[in-house]
Amino acid sequence: MSNEIATKEHYMPELNADIIKKYICPAATEQEIYIFLQLCKAQRLNPFLREAYLVKYGNSPATIVTGKETFTKRAASLPDFSGFKAGIIVLSGDKIVYREGAFYTSSESVMGGWAEVYVKGRAVPYRNEVSVEEYEGKKADGSPTKMWAEKRGTMIRKVALVQSLREAFPDAFGG
């Protein structure tokens, strides 16, 4: 295991530019791959476990995305973490409804997401509400990306949860 980092809890494969180019993001530039590699190494993120993604559409700059599970797994290991609730905000008829989870019917519109993160010793949870309009991933033509079109509730719930985790634990998640 020459250049591999292995621990009881986390296995890190050897990552290099060729591996990233071949298996993760063939369209990425050398600079984008280098930055992605450095982030993965510094944060101990394994892209093969979907802890980090390098995403590139057309000629736009690549985007580095840290997977939601990375945040929830790491939060669970923090001594002050006491749980979370997260859900979506839907327009149901003429009413705004806050719903836990990501379920909604075809007659409802997902407007946003919300999350609360509970921290031991803190009376009030860290709470965020986010708008789909602000965060929805879009293609060059302005239409939603496949994930946002197919899993709108799940995606906006993740955004709200990650924001709340970052605010609750800025030292662990970089604010």
Enumerate the predicted regions with their spans.
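Glycine-rich anion-binding surface patch
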Residues: 1-175
